[in-house]
Amino acid sequence: MGVEIQSPQEQSSYTVEQLVALNPFNPEILPDLENYVNVTSQTYSLEVNLCLLRLYQFEPERMNTHIVARILVKALMAMPTPDFSLCLFLIPERVQMEEQFKSLIVLSHYLETGRFQQFWDEAAKNRHILEAVPGFEQAIQAYASHLLSLSYQKVPRSVLAEAVNMDGASLDKFIEQQVTNSGWIVEKEGGSIVLPQNEFNHPELKKNTGENVPLEHIARIFPILG
C-alpha cells in the first residue's frame, strides 16, 4: 500500500525532513525543499538535498541550476564526508558541463587531494558562487585543519597559512582559537604548531588487534598447530 500524499495544507505542518520521509517522490514538495536549500542560515541535510536532486531527475523541466550549485557548495562544506560525490552522481552530465559546475568539481578535487593553495586560487575566481552560502570559508578552514592534524605532528606556520588562506593578525587569531579549543601548541622558537596526537599522526597510538587476542583463543590454536 503506497504512502498517502498530503495536501499542501497538511504538508505545511511538517518539517522538511518529515516531508522527505513521508513523500520522497512527490513533486509537490519541490518548493519546500528548494526553500530549505535557499535559507541563509547554515542548515544542511544530505537526505533533503539528495531527495531534491532525485525529484529534479523526474522533473527535469523544473530543475533550478542555482539551487543545484548551492547544494554542491554545501556538500563541499561537509568535507571530509563523501556528500559531494553522492550529490554529483544525481546531476545530469549535461548540467555538469556548465562552467559553474565544472569549477565546483575542480574545487572538490583540490580539497580531496589536499591541494589547498590551488583550491583557494580557484575559489577566488568563483566567489559569486561560493559566498552565496554563509560560512563557506570557515567550513573549509576547519576541514584543512582537520586534514593537517591527520597528516602531521607539527606544521610550520607558513604551511598552515597556505592551508587556511590566512596571514597576519587573522592567522594569529585563528591559531589562538585552536590553541584554546583544539589543544594546539605553538612552539616558542620558530612558531611551528604542534598538533594533538591521534592514531593517524602518531601510528603507535593505534591499537594492535593482535595484542588483544584473548589467551584462551591462543591456547586453542596450539593443538591445531601440533
UniProtKB/Swiss-Prot annotation:
Keyword hit for Mitochondrion: no
**Summary of the function given for this chain in its UniProt record:** Component of the eukaryotic translation initiation factor 3 (eIF-3) complex, which is involved in protein synthesis of a specialized repertoire of mRNAs and, together with other initiation factors, stimulates binding of mRNA and methionyl-tRNAi to the 40S ribosome. The eIF-3 complex specifically targets and initiates translation of a subset of mRNAs involved in cell proliferation.
Its family? Belongs to the eIF-3 subunit K family.
**Taxonomically, which superkingdom?**
Eukaryota
Q: What is the name listed in the Swiss-Prot or TrEMBL entry for this protein?
A: Eukaryotic translation initiation factor 3 subunit K
Q: Where in the cell is it found?
A: Cytoplasm
Q: Species name for this entry? A: Arabidopsis thaliana
Record PANTHER family = EUKARYOTIC TRANSLATION INITIATION FACTOR 3 SUBUNIT 11, EUKARYOTIC TRANSLATION INITIATION FACTOR 3 SUBUNIT K
> Per UniProt, what is the name of the gene that codes for the protein in this document?
TIF3K1
Q: Which residues form the signal peptide?
A: none
An annotated Gene Ontology molecular function: translation initiation factor activity
Question: Is Hydrolase one of the keywords UniProt gives this record?
Answer: no
Q: Which InterPro entries match?
A: ARM-type_fold, CSN8_PSD8_EIF3K, eIF3k, PCI_dom, Transl_init_fac_sub12_N_euk, WH-like_DNA-bd_sf, WH_DNA-bd_sf
Write out the entry's keywords from A to Z: Cytoplasm, Initiation factor, Protein biosynthesis
Q: Which GO terms describe its biological process?
A: formation of cytoplasmic translation initiation complex; regulation of translational initiation
Record's GO cellular component, any one? eukaryotic 43S preinitiation complex
